[in-house]
């Protein structure tokens, strides 16, 4: 656990430096701030690989669910991240969270409150890919482009068996258990359905598309929505 915290602390330290560097750049050299790409995926669908490919191609910061959760659960690391934005922008995040709680009948506990603040802070910096943790339900529409990565169950079971070198029966159990946990987390935390396609800007089926072409499709749709060429 201590080793994991050190890894997250190192990641956050480097990330803060990068954010600070972006703000110090001259306007003509500054990177254009683009919306955060949020990636929700069915277990075994390759959503993490798609997210990593998107981040690599766009030169975006990459936040996987373990990093986001680690930041949200550590008071010291969390405050470092939240302090990276100006008070005026933090106030805007807090106002949006209040409206999110009110409009969606969410009753956040301590962890969810912290998660909302952390994801909201990443959203204000932009130019990032966030995997999981219901990020698409947290960020306002103008700050994120949300995708859902799916695949047929049998393919997902085969993927998990291959990746983790376990029998297919064990892989099936793992897929079903993780899927159930993710559905429950989103339902309990955001009063929403993780499987409803209306909650996403784009749904990708990796049973029909390779990782690279999936990433290309996401980037193409993102840029088209912004009126930019890829």
Language-model region placement:
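Small-molecule kinase domains that catalyze NTP-dependent phosphoryl transfer to phosphate-bearing small molecules
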Residues: 92, 167-211
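Conserved phosphate-donor/acceptor-positioning beta-strand/loop module used by diverse small-molecule
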Residues: 142-162, 168-176
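ATP-dependent small-molecule kinase phosphotransfer cores
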Residues: 3, 72-127
């Amino acid at each position: 656990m201590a080793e994991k915290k050190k890894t997250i602390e190192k990641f956050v330290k480097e990330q803060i430096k990068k954010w600070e560097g972006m703000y110090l750049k001259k306007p003509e050299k500054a990177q254009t701030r683009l919306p955060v790409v949020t990636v929700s995926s069915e277990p075994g669908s390759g959503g993490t690989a798609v997210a990593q490919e998107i981040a690599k191609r766009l030169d975006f910061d990459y936040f996987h669910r373990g990093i986001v959760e680690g930041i949200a659960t550590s008071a010291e690391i969390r405050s470092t991240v939240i302090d990276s934005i100006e008070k005026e922008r933090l106030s805007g995040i807090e106002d949006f969270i209040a409206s999110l709680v009110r409009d969606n009948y969410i009753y956040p506990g301590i962890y969810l409150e912290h998660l909302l603040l952390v994801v909201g802070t990443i959203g204000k910096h932009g130019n990032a890919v966030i995997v999981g943790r219901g990020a698409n339900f947290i960020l306002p529409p103008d700050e994120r482009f949300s995708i859902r990565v799916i695949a047929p169950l049998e393919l997902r079971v085969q993927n998990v068996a291959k990746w983790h070198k376990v029998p297919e029966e064990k892989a099936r159990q793992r897929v079903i258990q993780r899927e159930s946990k993710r559905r429950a987390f989103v339902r309990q935390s955001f009063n929403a359905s993780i499987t409803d396609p209306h909650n996403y800007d784009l749904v990708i089926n990796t049973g029909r598309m390779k990782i690279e072409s999936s990433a290309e499709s996401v980037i193409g749709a993102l840029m088209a929505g912004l009126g930019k060429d890829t």
